[in-house]
Amino acid sequence: MRARRPLLARRPRRPDRYPPGPLRELAAVPAPPATTPVSRLELLALDVETTGLDPRADHLLSLGWVPVVGGRVRLAEAREHRVRPPDGVGVGASATWHRLTDDGLSDAAAPADVLPRLLADLRGRVLLAHHAPIEVGFVAAATLTAYGARAPLTVVDTLALEHRLRADVNGEVHGSLRLDAARRSHGLPRYAAHDALTDAIAAAELLLAQVAELEQRLGREVLLRDLLPTRSG
């Protein structure tokens, strides 16, 4: 049986397939070629806080992102936006881990107001996240609701990359791959705060440490294709 290709890879960008607006403008900017060296690559590290883990049933509450350009985290261009959930939807038990409250989100922006800013910052860039299916799923759900289509994205997942770096000869990893644990394995400090922007910055710093390790292993400059999931079949 032919193996399936991973979901978190490069998606084709045909602007005419998208409605006029932010999605078409994103698709109109070519994705970086797979042969782009990390030293010339632009990424956007993203983290989201949500009411739960299911993009089909749960809702965005906060998004934080920061560009990573030429191997540097651009903190001056970092952004964080709280998002107001739909009427009648409360934060619920999710407040115990992200500390966002219904009162605190009462004056937050609507998703339709935040999405254009995120999509504009993603133009020509690779989306970076730790356990990226969460971010990809919620961004897809939001753009489907707002624009009727999923955003075309090229995605690097630091959790998947950490699994590749830590797996033994049997493909097994001993220990946690959570963001804090992955950072600790690279000698990076633990952040006391837990919010979307802090976690986006933490993922960005983790990627740079992972790239440094990959360069040592490969004996050459790391390319975008070295960060993407391995395709088979």
Region locations from a protein language model:
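Acidic, divalent-metal-coordinating active-site segment for phosphoryl/phosphodiester hydrolysis
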Residues: D195-L206
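Conserved non-catalytic scaffold segment of RNase H-like nuclease domains
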Residues: R11, D16-A140, L144, R150-P152, ...
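A cross-family kinase active-site recognition segment
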Residues: R2-R5, G148, P152-L153
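Generic recognition of well-ordered alpha-helical segments
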Residues: L161-R164, A182, L206
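Short alpha-helix plus adjacent loop in nuclease-associated cores
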Residues: V156-V173
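Acidic two-metal-ion nuclease catalytic site recognized across multiple nuclease folds
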Residues: M1-A34, S185, A204-G233
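Short, glycine/charged-rich beta-strand-loop motifs at protein surfaces that mediate ligand recognition
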Residues: L165-N170, R190-A196
